[in-house]
C-alpha cells in the first residue's frame, strides 16, 4: 500500500495546532503535525469531555435557535446540575447530546452518530445517567469506529467520558 501524503494523514484539531507546547522551538517536528489513530481517538475523547463539562451561554430556547446558538458562543451543554434522574427527560438529553456533538465535534461523521441512554436498573444511580455514544471518526483511508460511555452526574453537572466496550447480551 502506498504511503499517505501529508495532506491525507490525520491532522490534530485546530486548537491543538494553534497551541504551542514548545514556544522556544521555532520548528515543530513532523510527528507533532500528524496523529496516529489512537491519538485521534484520545483527542476526540478529551475534546468531548471539555465540551460536555462546559456550560453553554444559551439554554435550548428561542435564543439557541438564532445563528449564535450554533456558534462557539454557545459551546457546551445547558446547566444540568440540580436534577434527579427521575425528573429529567432522558430522550431529550439524548437529543441534546446528539445535537451538541454534531454541532461542535466535526470529526465524528454526523450520519453515523448515535447516542443511547443506558437504563440498566442495577447500574443506575438516582442522581446519575449513563449514555453510550457511537459513531465513525473521519479518518484516512477509512473511518474509525468510536464507542464511548458518558456518565452525567446530575448533582454536580460533571460529565465523565471514557472509552466504551460493546456489551454482550
From Swiss-Prot:
It holds the Pfam family GPW_gp25. One of its GO terms (cellular component) is cytoplasm. Its main location: cytoplasm. The keyword RNA-binding does not apply. Disruption phenotype: Deletion mutant does not prevent TssB1 assembly into a sheath-like structure. However, the sheath exhibits an aberrant phenotype and break itself in smaller pieces. Keywords: Cytoplasm. It is found in: Cytoplasm. NCBIfam families: VI_zyme. Interacts with TssB1 (via N-terminus). Interacts with TssA1. Core component of the H1 type VI (H1-T6SS) secretion system that plays a role in the release of toxins targeting both eukaryotic and prokaryotic species. Plays a role in correct elongation and stability of TssB1-sheath. Functions downstream of TssK1 and prevents detachment of TssB1-sheath and its premature disassembly. Once bound onto the sheath via an interaction with TssB1, provides an ideal docking point for ClpV1 to be recruited to the sheath. This is Type VI secretion system component TssE1. The gene is tssE1.
Amino acid at each position: 500500500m502506498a504511503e499517505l501524503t501529508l495532506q491525507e494523514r490525520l491532522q490534530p484539531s485546530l486548537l491543538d495546532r494553534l497551541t504551542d507546547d514548545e514556544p522556544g522551538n521555532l520548528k515543530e517536528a513532523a510527528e507533532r503535525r500528524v496523529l496516529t489513530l489512537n491519538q485521534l481517538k484520545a483527542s476526540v475523547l478529551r475534546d468531548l469531555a471539555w465540551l460536555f463539562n462546559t456550560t453553554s451561554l444559551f439554554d435550548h430556547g428561542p435564543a439557541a435557535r438564532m445563528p449564535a446558538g450554533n456558534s462557539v458562543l454557545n459551546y457546551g451543554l445547558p446547566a444540568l446540575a440540580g436534577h434527579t434522574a427521575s425528573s429529567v427527560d432522558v430522550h431529550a438529553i439524548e437529543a441534546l447530546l446528539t445535537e451538541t456533538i454534531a454541532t461542535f465535534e466535526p470529526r465524528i461523521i454526523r450520519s453515523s452518530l448515535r447516542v443511547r441512554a443506558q437504563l440498566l436498573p442495577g447500574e443506575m444511580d438516582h442522581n446519575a445517567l449513563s449514555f453510550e455514544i457511537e459513531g465513525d471518526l473521519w479518518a484516512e483511508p477509512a473511518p474509525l469506529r468510536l464507542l464511548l460511555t458518558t456518565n452525567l452526574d446530575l448533582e454536580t453537572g460533571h460529565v465523565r467520558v471514557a472509552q466504551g466496550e460493546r456489551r454482550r447480551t
